[in-house]
């Protein structure tokens, strides 16, 4: 009974309808410079635009398209908006003649709030449920509360609060400066309508027929070309080598460049950009990009990075894992400064946070204790892109390891030192750590009150595991050459998590590469050498380790793995007689496979693992874990227009 009462903490937590977004660090627009496709030593935005011009997308014989004429606007008469005023998100987020049941319900709740003069500063989920009862709004799927709350934010009128007018997308929508129009005219010349449209169409068509890397267009994967040194980062593979709910809709169906275009030219957005726009308008903190000094240039660079990642997604799903120096996304992601986090991030957290922040993706909503004036705490709902797990701050034993499973998943806390949501199981004692505000919202009987979960997930749930033992002393291996020590404390990672009656399966994991050998699980080496990814495909766990192509020992280990996988196919999963086969009938296959690996080509089946091998590696070396619903189930629970 105690658990049921305490679980109401989630329902009565402050929903945070009032916007706290502040963007006072950058100027509106650079009055002295228009970004072009000419390479420049002084402007990183111009450099990235020049790379987009040089990109040779799939042409497929498409006719060059003409840009539609823009509506004439009296930009000269428009005055800059005051910094302290508010603008209704619904004015910005209107779409071309389409609506959904979810959006209509949000309108009804917002109208009820304004008619009855509700104080939105103290609005809670319980208040919303009470209003839904009065309005006869029935929502059986708990996940829909996540989206409904967002729509309530977006449909409140000007008397309530939605978004600060200093948000760059609102400034573009309101045409706050004539220079914005001048810059977008130049962008239209740079982004070839044919090439960009083909890139969008190709990735969206791929998405329709893609499940994971076992359904790639070509199962013969190319890891490297002689003239290239860059490769698709394992974190990108973990996010896009398998189709993840919600993230797929934001990155593949949504497009930042066309979003900017539509906001400025038509003051409306197409349906495929709607959820991307709402994600962006409801983000808590802006990002700052090193070397970019104004808001509009930041949005342009954001659109450039979205396009670069889209091209990487297209290549991943075609089995092309190498890229030219100009196409590498990692250096751009490392230049993003996350103003909501007060600590220096490790390389892998920086890349993960940057990829998600480009589209404002925050799929997890949790109830956490937030300090007030340093003397008390208030329960607030916090949207988070990922949950942080720090084994070095947890005291564990062999009898009580860190466990990520259906029982412990409900324990979250807020780390005031870094501004992040952390995983804090009650049996670990995380609450005594500095800066961490831990209040168990479920009492003791967690499993008995699982239906009252203080966690709502929109499609995917991500964990970042901090294993670097000296993160705060050194950082940035790729720039300083320093080798981090990795804490290989085993974590009990469950392949499945039941949350709110929905099954979330472990879809992918990024692990630290410690030993020199490709499959050396028992290595005593504790120094970081890179990362690799394990995807849980329809054909079993599959490993992506791009660094193995640079190491002869790793190539030999991969060759042995490929040969054993081939022999298991022929012998019905038996290892008996492998070496006799290798010296006899399998010698020709071994020679051809060795030649393939020397040419940096591998088949999908070559890198398949057993479930035991995969979970053993993940337990000791994982740094990123991604759980998600099955994509088909995610789609079937929603109306088609709600997906975008």
From Swiss-Prot:
<comment type="function">
    <text>Major component of the virion core that undergoes proteolytic processing during the immature virion (IV) to mature virion (MV) transition. Essential for the formation of a structurally normal core.</text>
</comment>
<keyword id="KW-0946">Virion</keyword>
<dbReference type="InterPro" id="IPR004972">
    <property type="entry name" value="P4B"/>
</dbReference>
<comment type="similarity">
    <text>Belongs to the orthopoxvirus OPG129 family.</text>
</comment>
<protein>
    <recommendedName>
        <fullName>Major core protein OPG129</fullName>
    </recommendedName>
</protein>
<dbReference type="Pfam" id="PF03292">
    <property type="entry name" value="Pox_P4B"/>
</dbReference>
<feature type="propeptide">
    <location>
        <begin position="1"/>
        <end position="61"/>
    </location>
</feature>
<dbReference type="GO" id="GO:0044423">
    <property type="term" value="C:virion component"/>
</dbReference>
